Swiss-Prot record:
<dbReference type="GO" id="GO:0005576">
    <property type="term" value="C:extracellular region"/>
</dbReference>
<protein>
    <recommendedName>
        <fullName>Evasin P458</fullName>
    </recommendedName>
</protein>
<keyword id="KW-0964">Secreted</keyword>
<dbReference type="GO" id="GO:0019958">
    <property type="term" value="F:C-X-C chemokine binding"/>
</dbReference>
<feature type="glycosylation site" description="N-linked (GlcNAc...) asparagine">
    <location>
        <position position="47"/>
    </location>
</feature>
<feature type="signal peptide">
    <location>
        <begin position="1"/>
        <end position="24"/>
    </location>
</feature>
<feature type="disulfide bond">
    <location>
        <begin position="44"/>
        <end position="63"/>
    </location>
</feature>
<feature type="disulfide bond">
    <location>
        <begin position="59"/>
        <end position="76"/>
    </location>
</feature>
<keyword id="KW-0732">Signal</keyword>
<comment type="function">
    <text>Salivary chemokine-binding protein which binds to host chemokines CXCL1, CXCL2, CXCL3, CXCL5, CXCL6 and CXCL13.</text>
</comment>
<keyword id="KW-0325">Glycoprotein</keyword>
<keyword id="KW-1015">Disulfide bond</keyword>
<feature type="disulfide bond">
    <location>
        <begin position="48"/>
        <end position="65"/>
    </location>
</feature>
Amino acid sequence: MEVKTFAFLQIAVLIAFSLHSASAGSKQPGAAGSSSDSVEAVFCPTNCTKGTNGAWSGCSDDCICVHVGENTEGSCMKFSGDYDYPTPEA
C-alpha cells in the first residue's frame, strides 16, 4: 500500500513539474512597453456605421472600424506599430 501511494505521489509531482515547465517557457521579463512587436491603438475622432449593403463607412483611410457583436455603430481606431491586421477587400 505504501509503495503504491509513494509511486502515485511521485507521478503526480512529475506531472505537476512538467506542466509548470511547459507553461512557464523561457521568456525573460522585460520593461513595460519594451516589446519590439508592440502595437498602439488610438481612437480616431469619428464613428462608423454599417450600411444597408453591409459595408462599414465613416472612418478615414488610416483608421478602421471596430464594433461589438451585431451593433451597427462602431468607433474608428488607428493602429500603429508592428502588426498584421488583414484589410477587407471591397
